[in-house]
Amino acid sequence: GHLGFGMDWAQYDLATIVAEIRAWLQSESLDIPLIPAGGIFTGSDAVAFVEAGAAGVQVATRFTVTRECGLPDDIKQEYFRANDDDIEVNQISPTGYPMRMIKSSPGIGDGIRPNCEAYGYLLDSQGRCAYIEAYNRELAAHPDARRLSVKDKTCLCTHMRNFAIWTCGQTTSRLKDTSVRAPDGRYQLLSAEHVFRDYQYSVEGRVALPEADVAPAVPATHDAA
C-alpha cells in the first residue's frame, strides 16, 4: 500500500520511469533486471513493458479477489465494489509514507490502544511511533472518552494484522470488470490460475471473465459507476 512517493505521486508515470531507468542502466553497462510494478492490469499492459525492455512485471491488484488470497471473502467484496471515489491516498501510516486504501477501511480514524508491546514493527531506532504520539495527544485531550478517535495516524501493525486497513492498487476500481455478479449481488471470486492465464494470453487490453458458478444477475461491466 505504501506508494514510495510523496503526495505528488500523481505526477509520475510508470512507463516514463521505466524508460529513464533502462536508459541509465544501459549507459552504465549494468545488467540488472528491471521489473516495473503498479497499474499493470492486463496482459497487454505487461507485454508493453516487456517490449520496452523490462525483464518481467510485478502484479498484485487482480489477485486480491482470488479465492487463494488471504483476505477474508467479505473484504474481497469491498474491493470489487470500490469505485474511484471510494479510494484515497492518505498519510495515516506511522511511517510517513503515503498509502492508497479504501476509504471505508474500519481502521481509519480508529483510536485503538497502541500494540507496540506485541508487534512494534514500525518503531524507529529510539522506540518511537507516530501513532503512539497521536494517540497520547488525543488521550490527553479527551481523558474521559470511552473510545478515542485518531484521525491523522493509524495503528498500522494491529490494523493490517486484523484486516482493518484495506490498502489497494490504483486500478482497484476496475476489479468489478473482471468478474460476474451472482443474483445475491456478490461478485464471483476468481481463481489465481484464471487471473494468471489471463495475464498470459489476453490481447488488445481485454479481460477474460470467469465462467459463472451460477447464472449472473448482470455482467459486472454493466454496473453503474
Annotate each PLM feature:
Residues 1-33, 41, 48-225:
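Conserved active-site-proximal phosphate/metal-binding subdomains
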